[in-house]
């Protein structure tokens, strides 16, 4: 039997937030980090620092449980507060979810927090057992939000040569050819010029095909700077005719590396340049931070990889040239706290808010 309680973190715990998050059952996620909390706080979401603790049954033994998870809070007119755990809360597996949901409800009701619904997005692999556990809870499946609910994850444990050999032949050959032909990848400073060049690349190639709605430049600027200032983010370019032609912003968080943002100009001359950008970032993070995995952050679901009509088909082709290991997570679920208010939210208030938000701000509500 799992026994889990929820409380707000102390000021001392918030001060060391990243240390706690990286020790979470899932190894931590950059979208649960202190840096991300600062960014979202400037764009209309209040970070709420939640600590789950208790005891759980694992392998027939009672073990202590602790999970430090960010809930982002938004006030919804007439309904109250919505909580969104972006890529959280952190758990070992789906079996811990029912106790965690009970902890949410107790915290919210006992402290009269006015939260009518909690949106969760835990990194639990979507296997049959997880789906069965979730089906037995109060959770309501909703639309996916983050791009890496389906994603390609490369294992980076081993030597550089061993990891290179683990790539598919297409990815490996692209890296080697670009290297052989003198393609140069540079890690660059986060100057305004470089960040604007990166933003332009993100807004150039294939974005219409993958239905991305870019946030304003200022959001990415603040995001990139926040993670760089924490020693967790870096920007890479390759150049063509003296101008950036491929860009990637990557993040190290705990033992995880993540390809967070990328862009490139179309019809480039150098074969394999985008592969070499990724390979350079991966090997740098291996050497400097000892990462054990690298998340390419977004593909079609595993069953849809060969579907040419899928909006992420092209991205999937590129990313699976590094690893065929595509992971499907369970996705996004709502936990209704107030049944009446949630029915109103689900019946049309959410869709209306999202539509009005995008019309006014020209970027995603979440």
Report each predicted region and the residues it spans:
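A gly/proline- and charged-residue-enriched helix-loop-helix capping module
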Residues: 90-133
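Short, high-confidence coil segments that cap the C-terminus of an alpha-helix
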Residues: 45-47, 112-115, 290-291
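Active-site/acyl-donor-binding loops of N-acyltransferases
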Residues: 3, 10-14, 24, 39, ...
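A cross-family glycoside hydrolase active-site/sugar-binding cleft signature
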Residues: 86, 119-121, 260, 297
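A conserved beta-strand-loop-helix scaffold within acyl/acetyltransferase catalytic domains
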Residues: 4-58, 67-78, 122-127, 134-149, ...
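The substrate-binding groove and active-site-proximal loops of carbohydrate-active enzymes
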Residues: 87-92, 269
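Aromatic (often tryptophan-rich) hydrophobic motifs at membrane interfaces
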Residues: 99-107, 221-343
């Amino acid at each position: 039997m799992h026994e889990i309680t929820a409380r707000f973190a102390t000021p001392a715990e918030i001060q060391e937030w990243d240390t706690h998050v990286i020790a979470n059952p899932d190894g931590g996620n950059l979208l649960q980090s202190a840096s991300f909390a600062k960014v979202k706080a400037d764009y209309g979401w209040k970070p709420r620092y939640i600590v789950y603790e208790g005891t759980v049954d694992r392998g027939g033994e009672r073990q202590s449980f602790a999970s430090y998870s960010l809930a982002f809070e938004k006030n919804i007119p007439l309904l109250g507060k919505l909580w969104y755990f972006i890529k959280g809360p952190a758990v070992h597996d789906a079996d811990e979810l029912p106790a965690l949901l009970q902890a949410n409800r107790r915290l919210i009701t006992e402290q009269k927090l006015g939260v009518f619904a909690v949106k969760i997005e835990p990194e639990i692999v979507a296997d049959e057992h997880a789906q069965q556990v979730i089906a037995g809870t109060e959770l309501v499946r909703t639309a996916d939000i983050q791009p890496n609910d389906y994603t390609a994850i490369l294992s980076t444990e081993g030597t550089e040569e061993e990891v290179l050999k683990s790539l598919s032949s297409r990815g490996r050959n692209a890296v080697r050819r670009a290297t052989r032909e003198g393609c140069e990848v540079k890690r660059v400073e986060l100057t305004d010029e470089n960040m604007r060049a990166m933003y332009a690349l993100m807004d150039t190639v294939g974005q219409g095909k993958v239905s991305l709605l870019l946030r304003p430049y200022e959001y990415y600027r603040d995001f990139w700077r926040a993670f760089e200032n924490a020693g967790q983010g870096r920007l890479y370019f390759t150049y063509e005719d003296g101008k950036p032609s491929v860009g990637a912003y990557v993040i190290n968080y705990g033992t995880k590396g993540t390809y967070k943002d990328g862009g490139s100009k179309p019809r480039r001359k150098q074969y394999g340049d985008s592969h070499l950008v990724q390979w350079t970032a991966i090997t740098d993070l291996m050497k400097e931070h000892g990462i054990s995995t690298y998340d390419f952050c977004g593909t079609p679901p595993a069953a849809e990889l060969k579907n040419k009509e899928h909006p992420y088909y092209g991205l999937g082709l590129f990313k699976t040239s590094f690893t065929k290991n595509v992971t499907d997570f369970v996705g996004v679920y709502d936990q209704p706290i107030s049944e009446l208010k949630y029915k109103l939210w689900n019946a049309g208030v959410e869709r209306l808010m999202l539509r009005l938000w995008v019309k006014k701000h020209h970027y995603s509500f979440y």
